[in-house]
Amino acid sequence: MASPPDTDGFSDVRKVGYLRKPKSMHKRFFVLRAASEAGGPARLEYYENEKKWRHKSSAPKRSIPLESCFNINKRADSKNKHLVALYTRDEHFAIAADSEAEQDSWYQALLQLHNRAKAHHDGAGGGCGGSCSGSSGVGEAGEDLSYDTGPGPAFKEVWQVILKPKGLGQTKNLIGIYRLCLTSKTISFVKLNSEAAAVVLQLMNIRRCGHSENFFFIEVGRSAVTGPGEFWMQVDDSVVAQNMHETILEAMRAMSDEFRPRTKSQSSSSCSNPISVPLRRHHLNNPPPSQVGLTRRSRTESITATSPASMVGGKPGSFRVRASSDGEGTMSRPASVDGSPVSPSTNRTHAHRHRGSSRLHPPLNHSRSIPMPSSRCSPSATSPVSLSSSSTSGHGSTSDCLFPRRSSASVSGSPSDGGFISSDEYGSSPCDFRSSFRSVTPDSLGHTPPARGEEELSNYICMGGKGASTLTAPNGHYILSRGGNGHRYIPGATMGTSPALTGDEAAGAADLDNRFRKRTHSAGTSPTISHQKTPSQSSVVSIEEYTEMMPAAYPPGGGSGGRLPGYRHSAFVPTHSYPEEGLEMHHLERRGGHHRPDSSNLHTDDGYMPMSPGVAPVPSNRKGNGDYMPMSPKSVSAPQQIINPIRRHPQRVDPNGYMMMSPSGSCSPDIGGGSCSSSSISAAPSGSSYGKPWTNGVGGHHTHALPHAKPPVESGGGKLLPCTGDYMNMSPVGDSNTSSPSECYYGPEDPQHKPVLSYYSLPRSFKHTQRPGEPEEGARHQHLRLSSSSGRLRYTATAEDSSSSTSSDSLGGGYCGARPESSVTHPHHHALQPHLPRKVDTAAQTNSRLARPTRLSLGDPKASTLPRVREQQQQQQQQQQSSLHPPEPKSPGEYVNIEFGSGQPGYLAGPATSRSSPSVRCLPQLHPAPREETGSEEYMNMDLGPGRRATWQESGGVELGRVGPAPPGAASICRPTRSVPNSRGDYMTMQIGCPRQSYVDTSPVAPVSYADMRTGIAAEKVSLPRTTGAAPPPSSTASASASVTPQGAAEQAAHSSLLGGPQGPGGMSAFTRVNLSPNHNQSAKVIRADTQGCRRRHSSETFSAPTRAANTVSFGAGAAGGGSGGGSEDVKRHSSASFENVWLRPGDLGGASKESAPGCGAAGGLEKSLNYIDLDLVKDVKQHPQDCPSQQQSLPPPPPHQPLGSNEGSSPRRSSEDLSTYASINFQKQPEDRQ
């Protein structure tokens, strides 16, 4: 517009021109006048047209004194893109320009005059000074609010809105026309015609804002003066609403940027200031709420205007670029450094970028150090988080810190920091403090000090089959394999090798730790610290306490892989809370494959106390393996095995690697003492190392204790062979078949490994702590457990880890697995066997026991367990006897095998090719040590089914001769002495209610130490030849026949089949017949023929009543008595056998029974003799009690060497053998009878 004429009337005119009125769009002639003495104050006037103005024909249509305006802004709406709005106390006046240039020229002129007017007005009584120069004001958004004369400070933006009666508008009575006035830090609602703001909200209190069409809303949080809620307002149109939204967001972002740097105290330069970089709420300085909101919002939008404060400071650079968004890597946060809307982003981008990059990446690389705030000094600082907030400084460092997201949480950040916890981004556990501590670096929590390689992040427990179980560091820290690497986190190791560890162990531990410990929680803190249970630490602690779940054990020999013995002890008992933890021990023991006999190392108490009622803690001789006590009442679930069920390592885990969980069955991890676990044969003593956790360390205790090396499961070079059998069958029936994965047992790979049967896992007598005399291992080998409830037999031959851990599994894997060769007598095979791998591999596993998995628990889960106390006694005796013979595994015959079908060919060792007889035949070779080979089955089968042929007649070397049908009453228990390798079947079958086919010895060679007891029918026909040398006459019962002779005899027996062996058929029945007389609880009890002390079994519940006892010599008694005649009933229950052996009276059994009783003595010889009796009495015990007695009565006398009742059997040797002879039938109801 042309300059106003230079006439007196126009001397004060600054600008004139045609502009439009926004609503009507009519053009009007506007005149901007400056203040003058003649004309008055500065004002904006408009006329209908220029002619009227020039001729002064009329007064202006309207005149607006600029000093009355509290704000002048540029605006735009749906109709007009170029508006200039003037807000006065009572109205809003706008003019529309045709172009942006025109708009800007008018805007600048108005601002200049407005500023002067305000200055004059301030001088007079002053309003807001014109501190803000027009230029400065323009700089920001072109709208400097510095000119305001209005009711408050200058406003960056002012919108006239109508507050709606909704949300806070209603509750706070803020309804009607208001001016929404925006400053760099606040939003104010000023009511029309009012000079005072009704409400002033901090931008930082705004949670969010938005618009919908011509409505705009703001949501504020609790910190707002109004309290939480929303303000809804209506504006002219959606364009205005959108403009409000964008402008407020910008202000929030700007404030956020500005505020952050301030809050950070520009420590960009000083790393020392670790300002927590929390996502700031930005409350600190009440940064403009906008910032807060901005924080939430992407900061992509560049700020239009620099916040005046920053501008005023004139240090645009000072503003901190750091944006939380920076952390996000968005450079977008635009604080305008120079005030130009764009520039901020630019500057900031650079600073941020360089800083951010380091931040982003370094955290990834950073060592775990949780940098202290100070540490984070340089943006590039390695500290991942550089948490220390310091980074704020103007550049990126802050962002780095702030941006925990990238890194794991920044430690330095205050908890409030948003990033603080987010640290986990990298995968540190989500909430874990420790992860946040992990310093940003995802992996490093406390690694920093050790700063282990990422490889270490392995605080996770390894669930993989191969991982070793967790180790406990001597310091008590648990070594956990985390991250599935199977690596253990060894806090102590991390911190430094625990002194307790031997050098190599320590090295191994360190190595282990290094390799695996990716995420140790220690933030470079000492292990102690790591383990402190701080909130963050708690997770760590829990980790420590966490047990490794990996089924497979670490390769014991595997360098670091080997357990550190020191860990075993770790003070951190909880670590071992898990039975599996115990498993660790053998690894520890065998660090690097070298066995660490040191019980101290290996046997640190696990801190686990067995709670199971029936279980007696395993003797200390378990060497700390017994620290773990199973809590299950009768059956132990064998987490150990489960956890490290097999220390499979290269070798296959014993099929027993799984522990039967069936409530009724206790797992029958008869692993011979975890021989597998023993790192080497030499470690054999620790052979049960595996079992350690289970069974109160049953496996473990023998492992170490066993004098003779049992065949360590570890097949190779001190590597633990997986000793399995810790798996407990949970199936209601207790069917061990579940364990069928004979693969475990039979793992072709290493038959060598004796599976550590669940036996070790067993908490209680299952394990039969080794008897004093007996090598723990050997004893185990000798024992077969019968669990009436579990329906599993426990073959604990240590040597034969494969003892059926789960009833069938162990059996199948182990006993049946006995290969025919096992028929061959191997005296002391057990002892010799130690080197043989426990693994029950197909035939390969000499140790294999019955292959057939079938075992039914007799229905009482508890029945399965025999009193542990007895068992312990038994173990003690066994140990004593073990000197005589490698004790058979002390498996209490807690499992009852029930076969319904006839014609089952005996329980064959699953993989084992031999199985002389179809019935289970433990190869005679299943010597105490080589139990696997020893044929005696120690298992008594009770067949419900008709025509079950007990193939028990496997005679060890000699065919028992197919036993003709035993006398109807006779339940023949032919159990080759354990010592007699040949004795094949230590399996006694009891058929109830079905005519039993005479047991035919399937394999001529192996006498089946299998006694058939049929309750309902005459198993009667089954008789095992008694004669040791001669083929046993069919009628001759296999009473547990262990040679009466001392060990030599036992050995003989072992060599010869129990029944068919040189010992003669009599040798077969190491097992006493069970008298099922109605007066006695007929319910199926586990009857365990205990071949002499070798395997003392106390039948926790014996069939025979005391009355029977008279006839019967308890094996234990015989064993204990060493020579004491077995005739006395008293003896029957005495602990000597460490279990009650109930021998049927000869009267009950008939002549045979007598022989059977003598068999007891023989049992020593026959230690292999039937250790297990399976009674299918559960169903019809009551019904057929008569039969049982008859059977028992009819049972042929045991061969001379037969343990039953024979005075010989009483001999100490016999006692050792007695262990094998264990007769116990547990029924559910009564404690004794378990009826």
Curated annotation (Swiss-Prot):
- Positions occupied by motif YXXM motif 1: 460-463
Q: Where in the cell is it found?
A: Cytoplasm; Nucleus
Motif YXXM motif 4, which positions?
628-631
Q: Name one GO molecular function term.
A: phosphotyrosine residue binding
Where are the stretches annotated Mediates interaction with PHIP? 3-133
Keyword vocabulary terms for this entry: Cytoplasm, Isopeptide bond, Nucleus, Phosphoprotein, Repeat, S-nitrosylation, Transducer, Ubl conjugation
What is the official name of this protein in its record? Insulin receptor substrate 1
What is the scientific name of the source organism?
Answer: Rattus norvegicus
